[in-house]
Amino acid sequence: MATYSNQHWLLSHIRNSFISTDDTGMCETVMLSDDMPKHYLRKFNSSAGVESHRRRPLKPPLASALPDRNTRHPDAPMQEVDFMCYPGLDLSDDEEDMSTHSFDIQMYPEVGAHRFRSNTAQKLEKLDIAKRRAARIKSINYNEEVQPPEDKDFFMRKEIPNIKPTIPKEKKANDDELSDEGVQSMLTEQLAKSPKQTQNKFIEFARFDGTSQVGMQTKRINVYLNMLPEPDRNYPLKVCVLSTAKIQEVIGFVCYKTSLQYPDVPLKSLQHYGLYMTEDNDDMEDFPPLDNREPCSKFGFSHLTLAERRPLAPVTRVDYPGQLGNKSMTSEDDKATLADAALRALKNITLNGGAADPGGGAVGGGEGDGDGDDSPHDNVKEYEKRLLNHNDMLEAPMHRSFRLNIIDKRFFKSDVTLGISGERIEIDQYKNAKFWPQKKPVSTPIDLVAHCEIVERRHLKALLRIWLKSNSSSSSLPSGCTSAPINASVTTLNTGTGSSSAGIAHSPSSPGNSFGFFMTSNIRFKHYDFDTDTHTAEQINSKLNCILEMRSSELRREFLQQRERKQERQQVKKQLKL
């Protein structure tokens, strides 16, 4: 605004600003009474017109047609006026324009020169309107009369019908006259009427419920129950279990939920059931059940089926004496012979797994005399044992490592890692061994392993022995692998009677060893002794013997035959001594 050169416009703007921002109205009364700039402007214009008429010059003579350019005209004399005008009044070219006085305030014809009301006037008007409304409102105080309740409303006397059942009273003896057998409480009567509550045998699996856990990973599974009737079988049972729960524990929890939701459905033990893969429409697939020892988080199935385990297919083995196991059967006669042997074996197998007797009876599964009958409980145990053996046989070829101690010929122990698979066994010294020098690892094919047994059992420890074929030309681990010459003395097997060294662990090369080298004309055997806990020893023994029984090599049969002959000779010697 300060850069604007028209002083008359600046003064007009200041005047209009005072008028528009004054809330009291006093400035408007004083400054709007007489608009002095406009009055001075009209007076200045009228005086300027009269003066210009008086100073109009006379006509020049005709002789001088061309004006003299060198002639100077004097300036007009100063006109004296009787008023003081705003400076810069004659510099404004648009005095008639209404917007020249102020660019902020625009006066429109339809609005007029009315000024907006101040905030004070608006507040006063609102207060006036509120007072008028309050004058039309009438306030009335309402007091509710509350009657206090009477005591009889709270303590009403109930009428109990005096109905006593007519029970024939028994005559009591003189000793029972003071007894209170005739008085029974309502709790006693309710307990007598209610059925006997039996303890749920699956209650221990309730701790795997994932709905009551906070901050732990859970897994939701829809389980179809195959033991339910047809209408209820089509709808899955929704369960939420912990992610760390194993399949065996999930089966127990599903049985627990089933016993609560369907109490009339009889349930068997956990060994009878398995979780099978299924589709969303309850179509159970032809796959084996999930492994009971695996966690449920390992499998990503959202729908499973709980059903009884399928019966194991009977395995028939036909041995051909004098023939190699890998012989290719290209002859039609050999094929016919094998087919006839398989048919005869299938005919001799009954439904309960026992072999049929030629006379018509079943061995181990039919009816017998005296104590030979098999109860249903024994059949269930036998079936569960077969299931466990089946699982062990399926998992036996898988590689697994065990950490245990090997005993060398100097009675020293060193930590080793024993790896067992369906192809070989590996013995590797533990890398963090501090005192003993590092020894070379041993890798032996499973075809050279003959037998595995637990020699000694202590409180929490066990002595495990693995027999394998000896190779005198190469010995990778001399501390645990001993070799005896052919003419060496062969010790006998300790059976626990008549031997002072029974139950004592011996070094492989010590003379008191329980079982030395077996030998034939061409085969010699050696063994490794391991010291570990009882549970690990049982796992290794079961796993390795399952592998050896499935392969049934010629080396193992030779070992067992030699061992049986030595035991027979030992018993004959004992009888001769007696």
From Swiss-Prot:
Q: Quick check: keyword Transmembrane helix in the entry?
A: no
* Keywords tagged on the record: Apoptosis
Using the UniProt annotation, give all residue ranges assigned to the region (Disordered): 47-76, 354-379
Biased composition annotated in UniProt, kind: Gly residues: 356-367
Annotated GO biological processes are: apoptotic process; TORC2 signaling
The terms describing its cellular component in GO are:
cytoplasm; plasma membrane; TORC2 complex
Query: Which superkingdom does the taxonomy of this entry point to?
Result: Eukaryota
Q: Which residues form the CRIM domain?
A: 184-309
Asked if Electron transport is a keyword of the record, the answer is no
Domain SIN1-type PH: from-to ranges: 398-550
MF terms (GO), sorted A to Z: phosphatidylinositol-4,5-bisphosphate binding
Description of how the protein assembles with itself and partners = Component of the target of rapamycin complex 2 (TORC2).
Q: Which family does it belong to?
A: Belongs to the SIN1 family.
| Biological role | Component of the target of rapamycin complex 2 (TORC2), which transduces signals from growth factors to pathways involved in proliferation, cytoskeletal organization and anabolic output. In response to growth factors, TORC2 phosphorylates and activates AGC protein kinase family members, such as Akt1. Within the TORC2 complex, Sin1 acts as a substrate adapter which recognizes and binds AGC protein kinase family members for phosphorylation by mTor.
The protein in question is named Stress-activated map kinase-interacting protein 1
Source species of the chain = Drosophila pseudoobscura pseudoobscura (Fruit fly)
The organism that produces this protein has a lineage beginning with:
Eukaryota, Metazoa, Ecdysozoa, Arthropoda, Hexapoda
Primary gene name:
Sin1
